[in-house]
Amino acid sequence: MKRRQILGAALLVPLHGLAQTCGVITPRQTEGPFFSPNSPLRASLLEGGEKSRLILSGVVLTPDCKPVPNALLDFWHSDEQGAYDNRGFRYRGHQHADAQGRYRLETIVPAEYPGRTRHIHVKVQAPRGRILTTQVYFPGDPGNKRDGLYLPELEMKQAKAGEGVFDFVVNV
């Protein structure tokens, strides 16, 4: 194959699949003290009036780059002031990946709070698989350097303003 053909073929690779390297299981991170079970089934956590909207999307994959259909993703994060809703389900929800392992979450950009940079918690589970609990971080956030839990490999890739991409790699 000629160099030009290889470069041209590389341009055909979708953005999903570039966000996380297959073969490497997404690193586990702490659940933290604010997880609440039984979140509502919903792909949008928006409740109206929010200013810093975010669309986070990606694919749930196996280590050999196969999509994980119907994977369960449970998301939660702080609000615009860095507080978690511990009585209800504001900025909490779960969804299932589609037949190609894709997910799409509409939410806000959460605030940082003392000791923590901006992040989104997530539990990912393949059907009948183990739960992977982790966190997704924002690229270039100044708080990343101060956060002892931050891992650069858990940064979402910025697709464009207000959109991020992160692919999860899980064992099935």
Regions found by a protein language model. Give the residues of each.
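N-terminal secretory signal peptides and thylakoid transit peptides that target proteins
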Residues: 1-13
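Beta-strand-dominated extracellular/periplasmic modules and repeats
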Residues: 20-172
